[in-house]
Amino acid sequence: MTNKGQLLQDPFLNALRKEHVPVSIYLVNGIKLQGHIESFDQYVVLLRNTVTQMVYKHAISTVVPARAVNLSLESDAE
């Protein structure tokens, strides 16, 4: 089931994953997590640092990449 949110989330998270861009993930409770996106699905993001953490998307407030991400490359993958 694809909705508008997935149409925005998936290309962004996939670009971060493919390019191994370091990210800071801020949770709704204010905690900051850092690492690389290892994988993701509709409900969770796997964040890799010294260990792999499974972070539920409903707990995420903001994803901040360490550098700019080119999303135009994602249209070629489809």
Swiss-Prot record:
Kindly provide the name given to this protein in its UniProt entry. Answer: RNA-binding protein Hfq
Q: What does this protein do?
A: RNA chaperone that binds small regulatory RNA (sRNAs) and mRNAs to facilitate mRNA translational regulation in response to envelope stress, environmental stress and changes in metabolite concentrations. Also binds with high specificity to tRNAs.
What's this protein's family per the entry? Belongs to the Hfq family.
Q: Name one GO cellular component term.
A: cytosol
Query: Could you mention a single GO BP entry for this protein?
Result: regulation of translation, ncRNA-mediated
What is the protein's quaternary organization?
Homohexamer.
The entry lists its GO molecular-function terms as:
RNA binding
SUPFAM superfamilies of this UniProt entry?
Sm-like ribonucleoproteins
- Sm domain residues are 10-69
Recite the UniProt keywords alphabetically.
RNA-binding, Stress response
Matching Gene3D superfamilies: 2.30.30.100
